């Protein structure tokens, strides 16, 4: 929507596209594999964030919560990006407010229970990786 593109020209040319093609929503089928590879890389970085959260001592619940919340929201956003057409400017791709509230409550409660916290982080990572 802002007309910005952070995909390198050489990567686009490898799949027969240029920056102008990204203004056409119909280019999504050609663009999707490249885009998904960048989302996969993003998921790898989020895995590092999850590992960091798991290393925070359990007694620091507020810190764990402060780290978990943006990670789970980010992973949910990736899941939506995998399903949506990012080239269609009319299609808004964002986590809705009710989902944000649900994530916040889940993260808050889960910091008391290691198993629940691991489940929330693992499910969010799985959704992001598989687009579900």
Predicted regions and their residues:
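Catalytic cores of Mg2+-dependent Asp-rich isoprenoid enzymes
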Residues: 1-132
């Amino acid at each position: 929507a802002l007309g910005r593109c952070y995909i390198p020209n050489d990567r686009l040319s490898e799949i027969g596209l240029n920056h102008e093609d990204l203004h056409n929503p119909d280019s999504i089928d050609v663009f999707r594999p490249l885009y998904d590879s960048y989302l996969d890389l993003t998921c790898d970085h989020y895995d590092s964030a999850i590992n960091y959260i798991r290393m925070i001592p359990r007694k620091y619940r507020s810190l764990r919560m402060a780290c978990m919340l943006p990670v789970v929201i980010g992973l949910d956003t990736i899941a939506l990006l995998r399903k949506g057409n990012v080239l269609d400017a009319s299609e808004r791709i964002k986590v809705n407010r009710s989902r944000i509230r649900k994530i916040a409550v889940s993260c808050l409660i889960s910091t008391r229970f290691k198993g629940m916290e691991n489940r929330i982080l693992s499910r969010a990572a799985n959704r992001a990786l598989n687009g579900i």
